Amino acid sequence: MTEKVAVLLGGTSAEREVSLLSGQAVLAGLKEAGINAHAVDTRDVSVTTLKEEGFTKIFIALHGRGGEDGTLQGVLEFLGLPYTGSGVMASALTMDKLRTKQVWQAVGLPVSPYVALDRRQYSEMAANALLATFTHLGLPLIVKPSREGSSVGMSKVNTLSELPAALEEAFRHDDDILVEKWLSGPEYTVAILGDEVLPSIRIQPAGTFYDYEAKYLSDDTQYFCPSGLSDEKEQELAGLAMAAYRAVGCSGWGRVDFMLDSDGAFYLLEVNTSPGMTSHSLVPMAAHQRGLTFSQLVVKILELAG
């Protein structure tokens, strides 16, 4: 049977616009390699029709809910269609930053100090009790929804007076949020392709932190690959990335994000099971450092589909 690939893009999540860019880039890369690939916007087309439309393999270029959270993966499993990236369990787990942190803590991997808060707790706690909950974390803080990507709903809190607005913003996007200690060092990201760890990238945003604008819109964000780490630190980071990736059951490809704190220690932030593939994206940058063109990268990811 001739292979016919659906590149799933767009969707309905808060990361729709990024996904459209990722998907079109992936589509162009696959076509450059001579693969019979077609764009499918899951906002407009039901994925349950993919098999009857003759598609034999699925490249997931969706980000966020409905594409990266295990629900789509479950449908594709039911249809018997091979797809790129992690399976149902790992996709669902890593979409939830809190549960991911809990797994990493259980196996002894380093995560930044945090407090988890749900909407019910927030509504029932008095203001002074709420503030007391976070005092041991110190200032500044970073507040984020547990189940959003691309830094959607995330805020930095420099003074306690800024905390209520940051909590409200995070709760606009999720019923569970995380309040974390602010880590002062640079951010690093490590891409994984099959069983191979790609070179790390150091991220230097022009603004306060690596938010949505810095990730996708700003030309002022700087990326360093090679990252400038010593060989010893690079090996340490690669080992941590693979351990974190495997602990939550990921497969195929993905990207693990870290912060290096002022104490010289790496702390895990999250795993992306369907990383961005735009002109600003990091996995293509790391793959290029390893000698892979964009087209070769997307073909390799497709070959890893299961």
Swiss-Prot record:
SUPFAM superfamilies: Glutathione synthetase ATP-binding domain-like, PreATP-grasp domain. Its EC number is 6.3.2.4. One of its GO terms (cellular component) is cytosol. Mg(2+) 2 binds at residues 270, 272. Pfam families: Dala_Dala_lig_C, Dala_Dala_lig_N. It is found in: Cytoplasm. GO terms for biological process: cell wall organization; peptidoglycan biosynthetic process; regulation of cell shape. Keywords: ATP-binding, Cell shape, Cell wall biogenesis/degradation, Cytoplasm, Ligase, Magnesium, Manganese, Metal-binding, Nucleotide-binding, Peptidoglycan synthesis. Belongs to the D-alanine--D-alanine ligase family. This is D-alanine--D-alanine ligase.
